[in-house]
Amino acid sequence: MTEVVAAFDRACSRFRQDSELTGLNDAAGRAPLRVSPLLLDAVMAALRAARLTGGDVDPTIGQALIALGYDRDFGSVGSVGSAVADPVRVAAIAGWRTVRVDPEASTVRLAWGVKLDLGATAKALAADRAVALAFQHAGCGVLVSLGGDFATSGAPPPGGWSIRVTDDHRSGFEEPGQWITVRSGGLATSSTTVRRWHAGERTVHHLIDPRTGAPARGAWRTVSVAAGSCLDANIASTAAIVRGERAEAWLQSLALPSRLVAVDGSVRHLAGWPSQGDDLTSCAAIGAGTGMTVATAGVESAGGPTGISAAAAGVQPMGAGLA
């Protein structure tokens, strides 16, 4: 797994001067650049995310993040309490349709001034790749977690994989959250509460609305989604933050179990995401012994145009959770 993560870092990091993505961004406006199969896959995954979300998840936001001061690893940028000297600047987004990819030639061409940021998809894609490789070698059920994004492969342990969902995956057990179990597929959380810093007099975060070039200012501070893969879960959770109030109907239409935390801290559960408290009682009364199964393995969303797969085998409550 460490080899997979290291390979993605070398190919897809925006913060490494020696990364392949940095070389691609530096070549913007020039001739198409031949890239490795890994970076080609990562760029195509990012463009797929843009297409499936109508541009709400757009990899051409790199320049907007740089304008906000997110031009180096977040550990160096700092968090709320750390300041970027310049006032908030908003950069125009060129748009994902300006990226030209030739899969047969393995080339990518960026328009002049475009800088790709693959943060919304590359980590989740790495989790899916890592868990597939681990399953191939281990021959048993595997769960991989990369920075709060989860991918599974193979048969789960009895009762499923226990995962604690919170605003911040680094938080301790004293923080509000919920225990759930996942039997297959992927789970991802997108949040405006973790990567935050001061730019001028404003507090900003890394989830950019491509329509404005500024941090998304929607109804939700955190969204968790279960889907058929970690990549699809992260695409949906990121898009939901950007879409704001429009996200509820969209997630429902895709039958993607979701947990949405509003800016005031109130929580919404959609499309079969288990509620707190009484779900186990209901399941015991039914006698099914399998909890709140919400989707069938491999089922695509109704109508199919989105291409985002529904949760592979269900999300279930793990006790009453935490308040």
What are these regions (language model features)?
Residues T2-A323:
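Mature catalytic core of soluble alpha/beta enzymes
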